[in-house]
Every structure is written in C-alpha cells, then in structure tokens.
Curated annotation (Swiss-Prot):
F-type ATPases have 2 components, F(1) - the catalytic core - and F(0) - the membrane proton channel. F(1) has five subunits: alpha(3), beta(3), gamma(1), delta(1), epsilon(1). F(0) has three main subunits: a(1), b(2) and c(10-14). The alpha and beta chains form an alternating ring which encloses part of the gamma chain. F(1) is attached to F(0) by a central stalk formed by the gamma and epsilon chains, while a peripheral stalk is formed by the delta and b chains. This is ATP synthase subunit delta. It comes from the Bacteria. GO terms for molecular function: proton-transporting ATP synthase activity, rotational mechanism. Belongs to the ATPase delta chain family. Increases 2-fold following exposure to low pH. F(1)F(0) ATP synthase produces ATP from ADP in the presence of a proton or sodium gradient. F-type ATPases consist of two structural domains, F(1) containing the extramembraneous catalytic core and F(0) containing the membrane proton channel, linked together by a central stalk and a peripheral stalk. During catalysis, ATP synthesis in the catalytic domain of F(1) is coupled via a rotary mechanism of the central stalk subunits to proton translocation. It holds the Pfam family OSCP. It comes from Lactobacillus acidophilus (strain ATCC 700396 / NCK56 / N2 / NCFM). Keywords: ATP synthesis, Cell membrane, CF(1), Hydrogen ion transport, Ion transport, Membrane, Transport. One of its GO terms (cellular component) is plasma membrane. PANTHER family: ATP SYNTHASE DELTA CHAIN. It is a peripheral membrane protein.
Length: 182
C-alpha cells in the first residue's frame, strides 16, 4: 500500500527532526532546510529533475552533489536518502513537517497580521514580540496581509487564536449594541 504525501512528510520530517536533535545540530539543520526550501521554491525544476523517473540515478546524484556541497553532513545524508528512496517530490512537504516540529520544540508560532495598510518591519516585530510575550512563546513569525476593508487596527491570527482589533469589527459591535438597545 502506497503512503500518502502527508504520511511520507510526517515520517521523513519526524525522522530528520529526531536525527538532528540526537546529534545536537537541530538549529543548523533547520537553517539549512529553510534555505533549501527557499531555493527549491525559487527554482521548481530542481525538485522535478531530482524526481524524474527517466533521469538515471547517477545523473541525479551528480546534480545533488553540486547542490549539497554547502550543507552539513546531516543534511547531505538526508538529501541522499531522499534521492535513494525516490522521495524528492515530497521535499517541500517534508521540510514543512520538520519545520512544524522545530517550531513546537522551540515554542515558535506563525501567523498573520491583517491590517488596512502595510506594516513596516519594526511594527511587525513589536507586534510579534507582544503576542509572544502574552502567550508565553519564544517567538512569533507574522506575515502582514493588507486588507483596506478592515479600515484600521489589526486582526491577528496565530494558531487557533484570532484577535480582531479592527475598526470594522468595533463598528460592527457598536452597531449591534445600538440595535439591541432599540
């Protein structure tokens, strides 16, 4: 029975996480995997070439050798394992699973800050720090989405929490309160 993409990602991501943790190179492996993900997204042919069933294993290995030379032994070994077991097509999903485990281990959360206008880096950083402190997290990675319809304020979405501090929501509450009073 073939494994689903999610099952493959869970198994390989968990294995990489455990291996990196056991060898005390978790931060290094995390940084390298994030760099690899960024490069793979910027150049999608990288994954498709290393996943191509027509290309010989020798050719794939030579391509991978050129790419992996700047990575740690742990990441090189992992990439060779993916190549050996024909799992390169699942690379991004595996990295995402690994990243999720890393974030959980380090009390890091990711989320979205929706605002009427784009926040600068300093504002986004202060918002992240404030949320992290309030919810006892080490860090919060926020992506800023712009939605002029919220009029002002911010809507924070991190994990299963939503904090709606938008002007649109406040006006909606005031309106509901006025209607209820009548």
């Amino acid at each position: 029975m073939a494994l689903s993409r999610e099952e493959v990602a869970a198994r390989y991501g968990t294995a990489l996480f455990g291996y990196a943790q056991d060898n005390k190179v978790l931060d290094t492996v995390y940084d390298e995997m994030m760099a690899l993900k960024k490069a793979a997204i910027a150049n999608p042919k990288f994954i498709s070439v290393l996943s191509d069933p027509i290309l010989s294993s020798k050719d794939k290995k030579s391509i991978l050798t050129a790419v992996e030379k700047d990575f740690s032994d742990e990441v090189q070994g992992f990439l060779n394992l993916l190549l050996e077991y024909n799992r390169f097509a699942d690379l991004i999903d595996i990295i995402d699973q690994f990243s999720l485990l890393y974030d959980n281990e380090n009390k890091i959360a990711s989320g979205t800050a929706t605002t009427a206008v784009k926040l600068d880096d300093d504002q986004l950083e202060r918002l992240s720090e404030s949320f992290a402190k309030k919810y006892d997290l080490n860090a919060v990675r926020l992506e800023n989405k712009v939605d002029p319809s919220i009029l002002g304020g911010v809507i924070l979405q991190v994990k299963d929490r939503v904090i709606d501090g938008s002007v649109k929501n406040k006006l909606k509450k005031i309106r509901a309160q006025i209607i209820d009073e009548n």
